[in-house]
């Protein structure tokens, strides 16, 4: 079985947009939806359900008409980035070498290097090593 996860996006001219404008409906933020997906994805994967898409496909129509909600062109990347950040945060702050596949460096760093800055603020001193010896979407973490 496969699954696509699409967080709710409020589009202009829809009933949902009216409910949003009337403050009857409050959509999730991108952050809230990404955090929820970090809980949902493992649950589905453990049940043998493959996630084939996270977030709506980027289109000019959605960009023009999105009023509110969890729309981001790189939503899937944001979720994968959260997985990497959460894996590091399970460890106590300190000095670490983090080995990552070249195709996953952007996920490790996060949007606009948010993960790196957050880790620094929390007391993590990390050295990133890019290597093909680590699988895509995975990390190898070594305490220094």
What are these regions (language model features)?
Residues 1-92:
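C-terminal scaffold of the Radical SAM
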Residues 60-144:
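Radical SAM enzyme core and accessory elements
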């Amino acid at each position: 079985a496969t699954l696509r996860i699409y967080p709710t996006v409020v589009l202009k001219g829809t009933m949902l947009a009216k409910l949003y404008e009337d403050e009857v409906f409050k959509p999730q933020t991108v952050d809230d939806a990404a955090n929820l997906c970090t809980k949902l994805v493992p649950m589905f994967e453990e049940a043998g359900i493959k996630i084939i898409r996270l977030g709506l496909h980027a289109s000019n129509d959605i960009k023009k008409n999105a009023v509110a909600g969890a729309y981001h062109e790189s939503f899937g990347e944001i979720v994968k980035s959260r997985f990497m950040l959460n894996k590091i945060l399970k460890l106590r702050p300190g000095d670490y070498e983090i080995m990552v596949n070249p195709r996953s460096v952007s996920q490790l760093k996060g949007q606009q290097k948010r993960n790196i800055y957050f880790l620094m603020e929390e007391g993590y001193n990390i050295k990133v090593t890019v290597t093909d010896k680590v699988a895509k979407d995975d990390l190898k973490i070594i305490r220094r």
